[in-house]
Amino acid sequence: VEQLIVVAFAFECPECQHGDFYYMPSPNVVASSDYGPIIVNAHDTVVGRNILRTGSWEKNELGLMIKLLEILFKKNERLIAYDVGANIGIHSLALAQYFGTHIKIRAFEAQRPLYHMLCGTLALNNILSVTAYHKAISDRTGDTITITLPDYNLPNNFGGFEVVPPRLSDNQSMIQSHSEVVETMALDNFDEAVDFIKMDIEGMEDQALRGAYRLFEKYLPIVFIEILKTDRDFVLDFFKSRRYRGFQAGGNLLALPHNFPVPVQGLNALF
């Protein structure tokens, strides 16, 4: 059963007498999820639809992430996680609710409307442990990319939006709306002992890793990274050269540091 609260915004009508308003329906709704209320686009055909129908998204993957972080939490008093390609924030919300004040999360989203929804969800749940960034994570900081956003009032897989053309696109039929500029950021901007990185940025994963060389020289975070659209060979070699162990997790690579203390069962080893 889909559970949602439809939200409508009131705007003052310039042609009406003072005090009159007209209402413009929004495609966004506040939905119940396993982790608290979350703002979703009712036209979203993948993430939003699954949350509306089941209360979650990638529940098995989220469960795996939590188990891995629980292992790290046994030796760390506070965890640091990056949600790269946060979309509307279901992963950040789940991890923040589960670990509470024991985790600090940086969530990055390039699509401004999704970033706004992410921020709204954080406010609805009074979550202070997540800092959200309207940035496209890439190999450099301070560059700008002009992107043509999809039409959020029509059905589509908004999480599949591609900031730059990837090696393998599955989204050429997306109906476009208007163009705007987003600034890039490299993960090397942050010099902190990050424990976990979830990365799903529709083909820009290789560029994001190129902007994180210093990070991986100093720290060895667990990485859960999508490899469907990106330069797969580069990504695999990146982790192999750093003595990571790699496992297939659906369309994702789970990369564990060589010193991770617990063996992995139930996933196919890639290296």
Report each predicted region and the residues it spans.
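Phosphate/nucleotide-binding beta-alpha loop and adjacent structural elements of enzyme active sites
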Residues: 1-271
